[in-house]
A protein has these predicted regions:
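Conserved catalytic core of the tyrosine transesterase superfamily
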Residues: 1-4, 8-273
């Protein structure tokens, strides 16, 4: 058990330092690994003595308890990454996961919103509510900049360069990039700042752009997810959408407008008048 924890700690350091994973991705890798570690402990199997049949029984268990095939595939992909690390770190000479197969899953294309649907969602925001203007600013920023939700919630006041028409974003692996922001999004954020100035923002959160009206702290990804789900429902949209839908729609609309796919992360085309 102690050796397993030592190996887990080394793997965590490897993911953090060598792979430069974001905290959320790192947590997901370790949570999935812990599922395997718990299984091995219950079975009385040392992690360095695992064979393919052990991993196949673990994979079968994921199916038996009703874990979605896509989640199964993600977990097993993380397990394979762990055993590649064990080979690289000289814990093992052979990889028992090399022939491990995941569930067969079809390619599921993400939902895309039309420009009209995006406008309808933004229009469904109730400006009379305390968080109304903030939510409009969030939606405009998500769409016009094509941000990940993790990038949105961590956006700082010191990252805004409105005069130049850019914002600075810290993406996956702590990589920073400059992203163009639309005049419409800038205007919505400036209107939101009139409300934000009246919020008692807690210490250590003063530099976050989007904060909770009640708590005075930065928003969580889950809060953004629920907000978008509710607004889409209010707008009569039946598609299964999430914050990432805005990012995917942004990229799709750029392509439809003639943008180069490789240029999408750093470019912005005015899609709405």
């Amino acid at each position: 058990r102690q050796r397993q924890m030592c190996i887990r700690d080394r793997y965590q350091q490897y993911l953090k330092l060598e792979k430069s994973l974001s905290p959320n991705t790192l947590d997901a890798y370790l949570t999935d690994l812990d599922k395997l570690m718990s299984f091995l402990t219950l079975e009385g199997i040392d992690v360095l003595e695992v064979c393919l049949s052990d991993l196949q029984r673990f994979a079968a268990g994921l199916h038996d308890i009703g874990i979605h095939p896509r989640s199964q595939a993600r977990i097993l992909s993380g397990i394979k990454s762990f055993f590649r690390f064990l080979i690289m770190a000289d814990y093992l000479e052979a990889d028992p996961s090399e022939l491990l197969e995941g569930p067969k899953i079809g390619l599921k294309l993400p939902e895309v919103l039309t420009v009209e649907e995006i406008d309808n969602i933004i229009s469904s925001v109730d400006r009379s509510k305390a968080e109304g203007q903030r939510n409009r600013a969030i939606l405009e920023t998500l769409y016009s900049c094509g941000l990940r939700v993790s990038e949105l919630v961590s956006l700082k006041l010191s990252d805004l360069y409105f005069d130049e028409g850019f914002i600075k974003v810290e993406g996956k692996g702590s990589k920073q990039r400059l992203v163009p922001i639309s005049p419409r999004a800038i205007n919505e954020i400036k209107l939101y700042f009139l409300d934000r100035n009246r919020i008692e923002v807690k210490k250590d959160y003063e530099d976050f752009v989007f904060v909770s009206q009640r708590r005075g702290k930065s928003l969580s990804r889950i809060m953004i997810f629920h907000m978008i789900k509710e607004l889409a429902q209010n707008a009569g949209i039946t598609k299964n959408i999430s914050p990432h839908t805005f990012r995917h729609s942004f990229a799709t609309h750029l392509l439809e407008g003639g943008a180069n796919l490789r240029a999408i992360p750093v470019s912005y085309t005015h899609l709405r008048a």
